[in-house]
Amino acid sequence: MALRWGIVSVGLISSDFTAVLQTLPRSEHQVVAVAARDLSRAKEVAEKHDIPKAYGSYEELAKDPNVEVAYIGTQHPQHKAAVMLCLAAGEAVLCEKPMGVNVAEVREMVAEARSRDLFLMEAIWTRFFPASEALRSVLAQGTLGDLRVARAEFGKNLTHIPRAIDWAQAGGALLDIGIYCVQFISMVFGGQKPEKISVVGRRHETGVDDTVTVLLQYPGEVHGSFTCSITAQLSNTASVSGTKGMAQLLNPCWCPTELVVKGEHKEFPLPPVPKDCNFDNGAGMSYEAKHVRECLRKGMKESPVIPLSESELLADILEEVRKAIGVTFPQDKR
């Protein structure tokens, strides 16, 4: 039976997700509604993608009984309101990362989903790429021996994108791209809470974080480190090393198609890319969509691959790091 999706917001990421859903079998996934704050934009997207319903408000989509799961692709500060709206209406939710601007927001959304017994997942698409799944298998099999250290880098000059440097939109490197580095290290070390976090970094002139390097000490004397930046080009790779070797996700590590394990190079080709995709390897969004359907058809309320407790942990780490270099957002004062 097809999973019936409602798309909240018509920005670039929502556009890609919608296009990718259209490439999947209609017997499994259907986009039944799209909402924007401007009805004409919603109608435009509905026409382009052959979506039956277009709404000029998120409230209307939340009330649509035909929508089974809502995909939230709004700007970071609008995630919480949209998620709460859809949960209150009884819809399951897949929310773009970062789920919230800070950990308090994430905890509120998680509590709401649990109190209503509804499915909620943070759309950390990286986890569902076959290359990431292959890496998890390598780790589970002990191929690398006793783990010692994990390292991730994600940086490119994003200053031409207004949202990326906009303090009011919770811009900056950490929430936009640093989350990919944190989730990688967290995945490697099994979602444990770090014992100690050390941070160095610089702020952008607009008040958001610019370039940040973080060291995370974990139980068992293992550690991870990452650097993220919205002004500097970095290697955009992620690696984990143990007593028997190293594994590395090659660039682009946030949507990986290549994994090197102890010198052996493996490729994981993506499905065909829909036309008009805005982001690199956009076709890879299909993996998380399939996972959501699988979870919902099994009656699950959260994903075992990115559980809600880990979404809370990631938000907690990112907030601590952000505040360590003196970046606070309006949401922190509520």
Curated annotation (Swiss-Prot):
InterPro entries: Gfo/Idh/MocA-like_OxRdtase_N (IPR000683), Gfo/Idh/MocA_domain (IPR050984), GFO_IDH_MocA-like_dom (IPR055170), NAD(P)-bd_dom_sf (IPR036291). One of its GO terms (molecular function) is D-xylose 1-dehydrogenase (NADP+) activity. It comes from the Eukaryota. It catalyses: (1R,2R)-1,2-dihydrobenzene-1,2-diol + NADP(+) = catechol + NADPH + H(+); D-xylose + NADP(+) = D-xylono-1,5-lactone + NADPH + H(+). It holds the Pfam family GFO_IDH_MocA_C3. The record marks 176 as: May play an important role for the adaptation of the alcohol substrate into the binding site. The keyword Oxidoreductase applies. Keywords: NADP, Oxidoreductase. One of its GO terms (biological process) is D-xylose catabolic process. The record marks 180 as: May play an important role in catalytic activity. SUPFAM superfamilies: Glyceraldehyde-3-phosphate dehydrogenase-like, C-terminal domain (SSF55347), NAD(P)-binding Rossmann-fold domains (SSF51735). Belongs to the Gfo/Idh/MocA family. Homodimer. This is Trans-1,2-dihydrobenzene-1,2-diol dehydrogenase. It comes from Pongo abelii.
